[in-house]
């Protein structure tokens, strides 16, 4: 396959370099990744300033570029400019830390893959589910075996897979739902060396989803979480309920 690889941790991160090395053994790999850390940039794109791109070396078998853009920018550039719209798979990662629950709305990693899905290209975001001790090697090995096993043609149009890999022994993988995992934010007030006040965002994770088949619960049990997601955010159940009440009011 012709694979477009990106991330949000930057072109020099261990996760993307290792994944490029593994994937290039069996596939034609093109890397287009940010030139610096772009975590939590969500699905932002660059429209008011130029995008710069520079060819870099990762290995003899990989074509690689760094850009001044976001992960979504990288996929747009890779698809339209570098790979001339001939892409079989978009992979974003390997992220340092999990992308589960409401994380996915902030995640540059997920947004890189979602950009591919919005082009109707099979796309995967992959994360090692530990920020402190990520296992990039284990996540890379899992993805290689998963690609041999999983039939990407079964994905609905405009749908991607969000994969979170536990650290340590992997018992297998399970199809999951996005959880309601979220953060309770608070801000620490600090004083700069110039005597000016600034704020540093902190947070405590909330994991109170009692459903068994959600992403973080499966990862906590030692399984890889594989969640199909798409960019269409309409709450269909709520829409039906509201129409029952208000449809007559709008006629």
Swiss-Prot record:
Binding annotation for a divalent metal cation: 8-9, 39, 95
EC number: 3.1.3.5
TM segment ranges: none
Gene Ontology MF: a single term: metal ion binding
Entry note: cofactor: Binds 1 divalent metal cation per subunit.
Cofactors that this protein relies on: a divalent metal cation
One family name in Pfam for this protein: SurE
Keywords for this protein: Cytoplasm, Hydrolase, Metal-binding, Nucleotide-binding
Catalytic reactions on record: a ribonucleoside 5'-phosphate + H2O = a ribonucleoside + phosphate
GO cellular component, one term: cytoplasm
Superkingdom per UniProt: Bacteria
Location of this chain's protein in the cell: Cytoplasm
Function description: Nucleotidase that shows phosphatase activity on nucleoside 5'-monophosphates.
HAMAP family in the cross-refs: SurE
Similarity comment: Belongs to the SurE nucleotidase family.
Protein name (Swiss-Prot/TrEMBL): 5'-nucleotidase SurE
Organism: Thermotoga neapolitana (strain ATCC 49049 / DSM 4359 / NBRC 107923 / NS-E)
């Amino acid at each position: 396959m012709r694979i477009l690889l990106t991330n949000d941790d930057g072109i020099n991160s261990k996760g993307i370099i290792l994944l490029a090395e593994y994937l290039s053994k069996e596939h034609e790999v093109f890397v287009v990744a940010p030139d610096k850390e772009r975590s939590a940039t969500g699905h932002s794109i660059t429209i008011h300033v130029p995008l710069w791109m520079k060819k870099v070396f990762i290995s003899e078998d990989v074509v690689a570029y760094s850009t001044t853009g976001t992960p979504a920018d990288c996929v747009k550039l890779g698809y339209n400019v570098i790979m001339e719209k001939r892409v079989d798979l978009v992979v974003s990662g390997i992220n340092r830390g999990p992308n589960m629950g409401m994380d996915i709305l902030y995640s540059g990693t997920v947004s890189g893959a979602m950009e591919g899905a919005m082009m109707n290209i099979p796309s995967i975001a992959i994360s090692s589910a530990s920020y402190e001790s990520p296992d990039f090697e284990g996540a890379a090995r899992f993805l290689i075996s998963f690609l041999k096993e999983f039939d990407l043609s079964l994905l609905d149009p405009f749908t991607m897979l969000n994969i979170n890999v536990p650290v340590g022994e992997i018992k297998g993988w399970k199809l999951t739902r996005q959880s309601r995992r979220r953060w309770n934010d608070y801000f620490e007030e600090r004083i700069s060396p110039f005597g000016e006040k600034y704020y540093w965002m902190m947070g405590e994770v909330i994991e109170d989803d009692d459903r068994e088949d959600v992403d973080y619960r499966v990862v906590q049990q030692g399984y890889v979480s594989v969640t199909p997601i798409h960019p269409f955010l309409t709450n269909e159940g709520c829409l039906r309920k509201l129409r029952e009440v208000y449809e007559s009011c709008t006629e």
